[in-house]
From Swiss-Prot:
Its main location: cytoplasm. The keyword DNA-binding does not apply. Its EC number is 6.1.1.5. It comes from Rickettsia bellii (strain RML369-C). GO terms for molecular function: aminoacyl-tRNA deacylase activity; ATP binding; isoleucine-tRNA ligase activity; tRNA binding; zinc ion binding. This is Isoleucine--tRNA ligase. ATP binds at K657. IleRS has two distinct active sites: one for aminoacylation and one for editing. The misactivated valine is translocated from the active site to the editing site, which sterically excludes the correctly activated isoleucine. The single editing site contains two valyl binding pockets, one specific for each substrate (Val-AMP or Val-tRNA(Ile)).
């Protein structure tokens, strides 16, 4: 007999954070991550793209969530036999870096940066952009995520940037790029336009209060026969002008008509003026007004007030009752918006009064009734719809606002004033002129800059665009090849975004980014555009060696215009740089420096098998990947994609440093470990796109530790404690004659298979549930029901089989769940495989497994996923034993409900079921587990219970709203039937998720509960005899003694002396108590431990002593 302890001493109160740190060190010291890649060399690959974060800020819980998901599937595919490279990447260019540098340098704005020096500014950006790279590596490593930092790509690297240039030229050559002056979302704080999808990122829309104004425009129109022919309703009340004063109306330089100062829209009365009312929430755009838009089919009312007639949408009249002095019983002449088309009006201001073709009313299909007056004021320099309509009518846009959002000298009254600060001054002027009618507070969702949180404006800016609208239908087609999680993203969140995709502005008038490779002639007499797609092309044309593609070095490259015979004009690069989202979308080929290098590698690694980010990236990274992949390669960029939700605080607020509503993740790791946070996040619905609320104090993570991690560890602790006490070594064994062994090994296969199916389907929630469910059965059924086998002194085949079975469960699950809880799985696996040498030196582990890796180091992450063919499953046993567990579980629930403690024996349980024959073979087990003296079997269910129909009203109501009243009435009368497994009510067949059949015991029956999915009933006899009460006390005494042993820190094998003054109980149940506690009753000994206990309101003293 050997006294070797083959396994480490494991504490039941493990410090998981410390254990995790030891495992992290083991991985680092033994290069386990790299080995996990090397051992798969030559195997099929699982292609994973790691979306690049910015490193100029610390990681937050959102980053950790994404990282956990990435790590789970990379690890899982590795143990499934795939090679998974995990190259990290960094986003380096763009606004995040520039804003940070401006802040640190104490400068702001284009002019300040230019004066500071572009070279110095970009040098600072280059240094600051990787400011927190070290911290990122610390967080990522501590969360047990394996990534290749050493070979990480950076979007600011010359090779990556050159691939971006190549992509641009490819698009240009395909005719998919154009330059245009268009209205775009514009960040005046950053002095740059934004893409339309950037306004959809990170909840950029937020509530804002603006002053909405209603202003009146004085109509005027030439008096002529042609006018009356076009607008016949004018003829009802025309008044010829007496004083035809042109100074009171504008002149149209094109048609050069002379306008009347009086208007002629009267029907039955003569009016001095006709005024049309327009409503706007952007008062600051009124100085740039050039036209008005109405809805052709909208009804407009002619509303008189004194000698002025106002025109307003009929549906909006009541909102202006006070301003228009209405009583409520007036009748108004109604005209269609189409009858207003072509009318002219007097400009509000003189700034652009001579602008060609302007100050007319047009029909716009975007004009709707609702807010406002049914009339839209048009400022084509500040509205997309405005620009499109006005340009179609020959009206060129004006844009008297500079890059910093301030009025230019074209509006001298407001020059230098920020547009939002100008609203009050404009309102004052409108009042002075008599054009103001109403100001109101308007609360609406308004887009804000995703970097500065300042409200955006819409402003016409020159930009280069990708013609996304030209191939958006193809993107929609390719999207059908992608598996989205959750599934609704494919056709809704992402699919609809693709269907409505607009051309993408990819140029930014900024500094720190990949420069657009476009050179133009500086003389419009000799126009020429050159686009470059490689460093070689640049070096050839400009004759210099290029070492840095950034500004200002690239700006200095000039050459004579080849198309200028005079030789005077010069080719100069346009100042713009790329939208950084273009670079992110270029990641698949940019990281490989394609097509200049690694062409075969890229072709073998595109598209990705898997990517993951949070749901807003359907407008960001996922979208730009899709645009560029479709345009360049006509392929989807990825095949499987998880869109997870967002992490919020316990009250539903966004996590914020300002609000101080979340803890530093490292503090949480040091307290509970990272596996606990991984499980908390990935077992929730946040992986399926929903929100996860997490408390600052980490209670949720602690609960995960207690309810998920601890049960796993408890099973491992139990095994090592007992197997070391017996000096036995566990072995893998998938067969046994013992019914409990066969059952748990069958459940093991089911769990391992479920984990595999779930992770193959990118469903971590179900995978974690399978782990938790298995350990629940392992701990609370298999181990507990097998305790006698582990406790007995004989080291027979049955004991060895029990150890082998438990060992097999632990090792197999350690591998199967290694991606889900990588650190704890590793700790358990190493404990099972790296045993102390027989010499007893615990400092020199010996690997006893045949799957040795270099330097004799093992890791669970170097294993293959468990081979399911090794398992045998007894389905009939599983079904029956699961029913037994169900009976026991419901019995415990009844005891709890009736305050009948578990250790109190009961006389009987009655089981009413059609499957009693299978249950009878487990009768002794049921009696022992439920703590009853007998089991009574019956099959006449109808005498004890009735089946009731419970309908899922919200779900069924959506499908059958018209029949719900009849269905509710029929269900209350039990007028339904089950035919061939289908439930029919009111001639409708219900789906399985639309109802439940509940077994309801008759009202006079106590201690009853349904089980086996409401198909059977059990009844506990809760009446107690004096004998049953005494036996319950004996069982309580056993519990008290076991707790005293634990408190005294006795080993599980220590025999003890017991002294308790309860002769009536010890005389009858003494042998039972001694057997259960390894004790003997004695008096007059010096105790090692004394406990005060309470039984039936009597206080007793319990003394125990360890026997040498």
């Amino acid at each position: 007999m050997t006294n070797t302890k083959y396994y480490p001493e494991v504490s039941s109160n493990a410090d998981f954070a410390t254990i995790e740190k030891e495992i992290l060190k083991f991985w680092q010291d033994n290069n386990i991550f790299q080995k996990s890649i090397d051992i798969r060399e030559g195997d099929a690959e699982f292609i994973f793209y790691d979306g690049p974060p910015f490193a100029n800020g610390l990681p937050h819980y959102g980053h950790l969530l994404t990282g956990f998901i990435k790590d789970v599937y990379a690890r899982y595919q590795t143990v499934r036999g795939k090679k998974v490279e995990r190259r990290f990447g960094w986003d380096c260019h763009g606004l995040p870096a520039e804003m940070q540098s401006e802040k640190e340098l104490g400068i702001s704005g284009h002019l300040a940066i230019t004066n500071f020096g572009i070279e110095k500014f970009n040098a600072h950006c280059r240094d600051s952009v990787m400011k927190y790279a070290g911290e990122w590596e610390q967080y990522v490593t501590r969360q047990a995520r394996w990534v290749d930092f050493k070979n990480s790509y950076k979007t600011m690297d010359k090779n990556f940037m050159e691939s971006v240039l190549w992509a641009f030229k490819e698009l240009y050559n395909k005719g998919l790029l154009y330059e245009s002056m268009r209205v775009m979302p514009y960040s005046w704080a950053c002095e740059t336009p934004l893409s339309n999808f950037e306004t959809r990122l990170d909840n950029s829309y937020r509530e804002r209060a603006d002053k909405a104004v209603t202003v009146s425009f004085v109509l005027c129109h030439p008096v002529s026969k042609s006018t009356l022919d076009v607008i016949p309703w004018l003829d009802h009340g025309i008044q010829k002008t007496i004083n035809n004063d042109s100074a009171n109306c504008s002149m149209d330089p094109v048609d050069k008509p002379r306008y009347d100062t009086e208007n002629f829209l009267g029907i039955t009365a003569n009016y001095k003026e006709y005024r049309i009312l327009a409503w706007t929430t952007t008062t600051w755009t009124l100085p740039s007004n050039l036209a008005l838009a109405v809805g052709s089919d909208i009804d407009y009312a002619l509303v008189p007030k004194g000698d002025v007639c106002y025109i307003i949408a009929a549906s909006s009249v009541s909102k202006y009752a006070k301003e228009l002095e209405l009583k409520g019983d007036e009748q108004f002449t109604i005209i269609k918006g189409s009858e207003l088309q072509g009318l002219s009006y007097k400009p509000l201001f003189d700034y652009f009064k001579n602008h060609p073709n302007s100050f007319k009313i047009f029909a716009g299909d975007f004009v709707v009734e609702g807010d406002g007056t049914g009339v839209v004021h048009m400022a084509p320099g500040f509205g997309e719809d405005d620009q499109i309509l006005c340009e179609s009518k020959g009206i060129k846009l004006v844009c008297p606002v500079d890059n910093s959002g301030k009025f230019t000298k074209e509006i001298p009254d407001l020059e230098g004033l920020q547009v939002f600060d100008a609203n009050d001054k404009i309102i004052i002027k409108l009042k002075e002129q008599g054009n103001w009618l109403k100001t109101e507070q308007y609360i609406h969702n308004y887009p804000h800059c995703w970097r500065t949180d300042t409200p955006l404006i819409y402003k016409a800016v020159p930009s280069w665009y990708v013609k996304v609208t030209e191939f958006k239908d193809r993107m929609v087609e390719l999207n059908q090849q992608i598996n989205w999680i959750p599934t609704h993203v494919k056709d809704n969140l992402f699919g609809k975004w693709l269907e409505n995709a607009r051309d993408w502005s990819i140029s930014r008038n900024r500094f720190w980014g990949t420069p657009l490779p476009v050179w133009k002639s500086d003389d419009p007499k000799y126009p020429r555009i050159d686009v470059y797609g490689s460093i070689e092309e640049l070096e050839k044309d400009f004759g210099v060696k290029i070492t840095d593609l950034h500004r200002p070095f690239i700006d200095e490259l000039t050459r004579a215009n080849p198309d200028d015979p005079t030789g005077k004009s010069t080719m100069r690069r346009i100042e713009d740089v790329f939208d950084c989202w273009f670079e992110s979308g270029s990641m698949p080929y940019g990281q490989a420096h394609y097509p200049f290098e690694n062409k075969q590698w890229f072709e073998e690694h595109f598209p990705a098998d898997f990517i993951v980010e949070y749901s807003a990236q359907t407008r960001g990274w996922f979208y730009t990947l899709m645009v560029l992949s479709t345009a360049l390669f006509d392929r989807p960029p990825f095949l499987n994609c998880i869109c997870h939700g967002v992490i919020l605080d316990a009250t539903g607020q966004k996590l914020s440093k300002r609000l101080n509503n979340y803890a530093d993740p490292l503090e949480l790791f040091d307290k509970y470990g990272s596996d606990a946070l991984r499980v908390t996040m990935l077992s929730s619905n946040v992986v399926k796109g929903q929100e996860l609320l997490i408390d600052k104090d980490g209670k949720m993570v602690f609960d995960t530790l207690r309810l998920f991690i601890k049960p796993i560890w408890n099973a491992y602790h139990f095994f090592t404690m007992y197997v070391n006490a017996d000096h036995i070594k566990g072995e893998l064994n998938f067969t046994s004659e013992n019914v409990l062994d066969v059952y748990i090994l069958s459940k093991l296969k089911i769990a391992v298979e479920k984990i595999k199916e779930s992770l193959d389907s990118f469903d971590t929630g179900t995978a974690y549930h399978a782990v938790s469910e298995f350990f629940e059965v392992l701990n609370n059924w298999y181990i507990r029901r097998s305790r006698a086998r582990f406790w007995k002194s004989e080291k027979d085949a049955d004991k060895q089989s029990a150890y082998n079975t438990l060992y097999t469960c632990l090792e197999t699950m350690a591998i199967a769940m290694s991606s889900l809880v990588p650190l704890i799985s590793e700790a358990i696996y190493l404990g099972l495989y790296c045993h102390p040498r027989k010499s007893g030196d615990p400092e020199k582990p010996e690997c006893l497994d045949s799957r040795l890796c270099g330097n004799d180091n093992l890791s669970v992450h170097l294993c293959d996923y468990p081979d399911l063919s090794k398992f045998k499953i007894n389905s009939e046993l599983v079904d029956t034993m699961d029913t037994v567990l169900d009976i026991c579980s419901h019995s415990l629930f009844i005891r709890s409900s009736e305050n009948a403690r578990v250790r109190q024996p009961l006389s009987s349980i009655t089981i009413i079921s059609k499957n009693n024959d299978k249950l009878k073979s487990f009768e002794d087990l049921i009696k022992d587990e439920i703590n009853v003296k007998s089991v009574i079997y019956r099959d006449d269910l109808e005498n004890y219970a009735v089946k009731k129909l419970s309908i899922n009203f919200p779900l069924l109501g959506k499908r059958l709203p018209a029949k719900m009243k009849d269905i509710i009435a029929a269900s209350k009368k039990n007028e339904w039937e089950v035919t061939s497994g289908s439930l029919i009510i009111c001639n409708e067949t219900l789906n399985s998720d639309e109802y439940k059949l509940i077994l309801e015991p008759h009202s006079h029956i106590k201690g009853a509960s349904s089980f086996a999915h409401n198909s059977s009933l059990l009844i506990l006899d809760l009446e107690l005899t004096p004998e049953l009460i005494d036996e319950g006390i004996a069982r309580d005494i056993v519990r008290f003694i076991q707790q005293a042993r634990k408190n005294a820190d006795f080993a599980i094998t220590d025999r003890i002396l017991i002294d308790i003054n309860l002769p009536k109980i010890t005389d009858i149940y003494g042998e039972f108590i001694k057997e259960q506690t390894l004790g003997e009753f004695a008096k007059d000994f010096i105790p090692d431990h004394i406990s005060e206990i309470e039984l039936d309101n009597h206080k007793l003293q319990l003394k125990i002593k360890k026997v040498n």
